[in-house]
């Protein structure tokens, strides 16, 4: 019996992670159903990542890596790059990195250039010569962004003042909690409901007397987030601690906000002066 239904995707994953004998078979079907599903590309990427994290056979790993290419997802490109060092998965991984990177000039950076050069050196299939030429052409056309790096470092002054770097542009090592919804993308931390998960992100380390510096931008109307302080994990920071609003309050859905709900307010406690936002995408 073969069932073609999105409803079988999660049960297959549960079988794969609870039954070692059926893991490969279940994950192979899990990948096929995910690929054919109505999920958005971000959700599909999350499923392929979960399949890889379950450590299946090389064949299933290669199927997941190949499937990631169709998501055209930045995180997928970076995840696939990690599999280029394993000879058994190198070809599938290299092809996926190439198929994503060369279709997205906006992803290009010094780090992505290095990845593409590694892809060029890794590819060995019948079309490798043509693929290398495509990579060379892409790199040549995007020289203007070669100096752009996704890596962030503390300045000498910040180090002297005792600041700690919580996010360097590519890894989430300082964080715990909802690491599925908060993802490193092109040097910044990106969060969207389209990943299909909910919950808060927390620093692993607790801080008492601190200064937190960060920049942000909204990529769509009505974004609602916040910075929680003095809050336990696993609860609503706005009610069990303090939540400083990060809110695109110009959106029509927020027309009736009270003064202690606008951006910059400590929600329900300390009101902030309401500002007028600039265009979406402005930091």
Residue ranges, per PLM feature:
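Core register positions within helices of long alpha-helical scaffolds
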Residues: 2-3, 29-32, 67-70, 96-99, ...
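Amphipathic alpha-helical scaffolding segments comprising HEAT/armadillo-like alpha-solenoid repeats
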Residues: 4-16, 38-52, 62, 73-84, ...
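Short inter-helical turns and helix N-cap capping residues of alpha-solenoid HEAT/ARM repeat scaffolds
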Residues: 5, 18-20, 56-57, 85-89, ...
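Glycine-centered coil turns and helix-coil junctions that link the paired helices
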Residues: 19, 33-37, 86, 100-104
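Beta-propeller blade termini and top-face loops
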Residues: 22-25, 32-35, 95, 236, ...
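Residue-level detector of extended alpha-helical repeat arrays and alpha-solenoid scaffolds
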Residues: 23, 27, 61, 77, ...
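Long beta-sheet-rich domains in secretory-pathway and surface-associated proteins
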Residues: 55, 74, 92, 122-123
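Carbohydrate-interacting regions of secretory-pathway proteins
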Residues: 146-283
């Amino acid at each position: 019996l073969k069932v073609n239904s999105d409803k079988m995707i999660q049960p297959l994953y549960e079988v794969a992670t609870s039954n070692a004998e059926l893991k490969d078979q279940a994950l192979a079907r899990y990948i096929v159903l995910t690929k054919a599903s109505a999920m958005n590309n971000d959700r599909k990427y999350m499923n392929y990542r979960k399949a890889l994290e379950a450590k299946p056979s090389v064949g299933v790993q290669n199927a997941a890596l190949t499937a990631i290419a169709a998501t055209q997802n930045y995180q997928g490109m970076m995840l696939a790059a990690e599999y280029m060092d394993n000879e058994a998965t190198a070809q599938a991984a290299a092809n996926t990195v190439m198929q994503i990177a060369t279709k997205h000039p906006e992803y290009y950076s010094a780090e992505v250039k290095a990845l593409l050069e590694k892809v060029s050196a890794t590819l060995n299939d019948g079309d490798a010569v043509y693929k290398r030429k495509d990579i060379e052409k892409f790199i040549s056309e995007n020289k203007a962004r070669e100096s752009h790096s996704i890596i962030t470092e503390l300045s000498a002054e910040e180090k002297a003042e005792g600041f700690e770097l919580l996010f360097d542009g590519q890894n989430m090592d300082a964080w715990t909690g909802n690491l599925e919804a908060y993802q490193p993308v092109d040097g910044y931390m990106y969060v969207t409901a389209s990943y299909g998960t909910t919950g808060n992100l927390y620093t692993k380390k607790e801080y008492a007397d601190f200064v937190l510096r960060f920049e942000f931008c909204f990529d769509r109307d009505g974004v609602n987030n916040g910075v929680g302080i003095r809050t336990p994990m696993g609860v609503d920071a706005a009610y069990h601690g303090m939540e400083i609003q990060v809110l695109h309050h110009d959106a029509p859905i927020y027309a009736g906000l009270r003064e202690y709900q606008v951006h910059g307010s400590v929600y329900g406690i300390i009101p902030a002066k309401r500002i007028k936002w600039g265009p979406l995408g402005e930091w």
